[in-house]
């Protein structure tokens, strides 16, 4: 696994985008909850930027999902184990949940009503907004409290989710560490067995050389004995032929 892996490049961009989105979400919440009247342009700009940022993050997460599907289809080609894939899937799932929570907060009916109120205040101006706000203080005071409560719940959920991700990553790192230890022990055992086999092969080579030397000596002795046997046969044959020749000559002279 290389640091040039495109997953980590896109992951870094997604993390930056999430940080930006969380900052925009905090500012957007302050604009809606703040006692001071914000301009309509600022509210609209913050809302649009936040929505565009969340949409961009969702697209990047879809791209990361596709890369994981490709890796799962051919894991040997990319040399990624199941633990690394689980870590990547956990990052995508947690980030998608963060985006979903912010979108749910933005689309809540109470938040929409409060946003509409702020927009009306911005259009009517400070003086008219004060007169208009005096008649509906109770109604929007309740909406303010609901938004504050929802925002606090959102922050608590995000903190709990981040803690869960950290714990999952710690567990996965422990699994990876254990796997590395097992592989190290296996490599040491294999190395020891290879050394033993090398010693055995060396001993066998020496024995083979000794056997070959003894075999050469035996072959030389056999050749020498064979040569001596051949010479004796030749002398015997000559003696027999000489005797036969003498007999023939004797018979010839007698006759």
From Swiss-Prot:
Region (Interaction with BLTP3B): 2-112
Major location (coarse): Golgi
Any one GO molecular function term: syntaxin binding
Topological domains annotated Cytoplasmic: 2-234
Keyword hit for Cytoplasm: no
Modified residues (N-acetylserine): 2
Cellular component, GO, one term: perinuclear region of cytoplasm
Transmembrane segments: 235-255
Domain of life: Eukaryota
Summary of the tissues where the protein is detected: Widely expressed, with relatively higher expression in brain, lung and kidney.
Xref: Pfam families: SNARE (PF05739), STX6_10_61_N (PF09177)
Family membership: Belongs to the syntaxin family.
Reported function: SNARE promoting movement of transport vesicles to target membranes. Targets endosomes to the trans-Golgi network, and may therefore function in retrograde trafficking. Together with SNARE STX12, promotes movement of vesicles from endosomes to the cell membrane, and may therefore function in the endocytic recycling pathway.
Name this protein carries in UniProt: Syntaxin-6
Species whose genome carries this gene: Rattus norvegicus (Rat)
């Amino acid at each position: 696994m290389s640091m040039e892996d495109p997953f980590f490049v896109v992951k870094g961009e997604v993390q930056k985008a999430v940080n930006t989105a969380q900052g925009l979400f905090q500012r957007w919440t302050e604009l809606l909850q703040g006692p001071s009247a914000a301009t309509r342009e600022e509210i609209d700009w913050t809302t649009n930027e936040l929505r565009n940022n969340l949409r961009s993050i969702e697209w990047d997460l879809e791209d990361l999902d596709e890369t994981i599907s490709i890796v799962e289809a051919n894991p040997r080609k990319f040399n990624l184990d199941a633990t690394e894939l689980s870590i990547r899937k956990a990052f995508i799932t947690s980030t998608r949940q963060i985006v979903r929570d912010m979108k749910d907060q933005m689309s809540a009916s109470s938040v929409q009503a409060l946003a509409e109120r702020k927009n009306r205040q911005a259009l009517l101006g400070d003086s008219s907004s004060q007169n208009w706000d005096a008649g509906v203080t109770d109604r929007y005071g309740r909406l303010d409290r609901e938004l504050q409560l929802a925002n606090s719940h959102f922050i608590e959920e995000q903190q709990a989710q981040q803690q869960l991700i950290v714990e999952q990553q710690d567990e996965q790192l422990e699994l990876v560490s254990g796997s590395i230890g097992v592989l190290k022990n296996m490599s040491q055992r294999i190395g020891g067995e290879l050394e033993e086999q090398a010693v055995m092969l060396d001993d066998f080579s020496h024995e083979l050389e000794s056997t070959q030397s003894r075999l050469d000596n035996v072959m030389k002795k056999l050749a020498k004995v064979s040569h001596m046997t051949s010479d004796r046969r030749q002398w015997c044959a000559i003696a027999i032929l000489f005797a036969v020749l003498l007999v023939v000559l004797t018979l010839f002279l007698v006759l």
